[in-house]
Amino acid sequence: MQELEQLPKPVEEQNTITSQTTAKKKDAPDTSGLEAAVGMSRKWDAREAGREVAETAIKGLTRPPDFFLLFSTIHYEKHGGFQEFINGVWDVLPKGTPLIGGTVVGFMNNYGCYTRGASALAVSYSNMDVSIGIGHNTKKNPNKAAENCARNILKNFKDSNYKESFVFQLVSGPTMPHFPGFGSGFILKGKVRSALASKLIEVSTKRLQKGIGREDEVLEKMSKSMEHTHIMSGSSSDDMKLSKNYQFFNREIFNNSVVAIGLKSDRKMNLKYGHGFHRLFDQALKVTKKAFGGKIIKKINNVNAVNEFIKTIHWSEDMLDERLHEKTFFFPLGFEYADKTLSPAAIGAILGGGFSFSFRANSDNLFVLTASGQSIVNAIDACMDRDSILTFGISCCANLVTLGDDIYRVQEQIQKYLKDFLVIFTLGEGVYLPSEKIPKFFNETNIVLSIK
């Protein structure tokens, strides 16, 4: 992906970070003790970036943070390493501060939009209980990983008297497997290869933990363990190459894991979600053969799924190349949950006559979806609360592709009414609301937490 750059000079070339945060503190409204500040760094060196992202966040608070959310792009792996990056953060961050985070495609905050660098959210509030948790081997055993993560969080909430509760989890997203004799890539053509590849992807995912992320299964289990809690789930990723991703937990770095933070407070916590997509055609495409629990679609209307899909949207086979997953961002398939919520699902890989999603389709009726740039912009804006003190959200990395430079227009619009905010770009988005009682997973969707 082409790196997003701000129209002004890069942040590390400006001497504005300290003055920006100081100015905001001076004219900030009375928050009755709740403070939230966003940190930022675009330094290339991992350790220096870690220090700067922590420093710029903490300078926005008048008290030490009660928790710290940390996100970075994948490039620090080759510029000092993620352990050095984390060490740089802890050079500055007060000892014992709960910290979770991981690698993401990019982020949007009050400084701009970026696909290289690091950003963080530091929060301080006295009337709030905080607990963090972790679970491992999410691709091999998502249920066990979710159980362990939820158990870690809940054990610290036994004595909490606050009613408002929220969990944010970051789960290791999909990675591209490598099969000897097949290579690796988004397109595997040929009947023999594709039939074998469908089976190999499931085996690779469950045994080698290279393949489909199974984040939707993690969310489903978490929602059962915490049925009265609002949950927001994002998928960790690299720069959309689907090679690797990492999760941060205090001072350590993991992969194939779920890291989560739970909050209980007397503050109202609102969770909104939405996307700008609608049906292109009312007629559903009927799934007649599938595998891997609905993650691999083999046949639609009793014919090869790929052929039926490209026929429906009037594409030629020439469109089926290594950039297919990006092309289908504009025309994803989708299905409806029991409450009629429409879930966009971008095609992940072509497996001969079939294709894969990055999560399970919960219905055998698929619809071709479409959206305009304006409807996507409106969907992001609609998730934001104008009078929020703390704003943290996730947005699909596909929005970076579909919107292009218009993503700056989104950032500028939000900045008109929010002084500090952080939105990370992820590979998949999930939400659970106790009022709906349905764990939902999506692509190309926005989910935003607002605390007033």
Model-derived regions: residue spans:
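Hydrophobic alpha/beta core scaffold segments
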Residues: 2-452
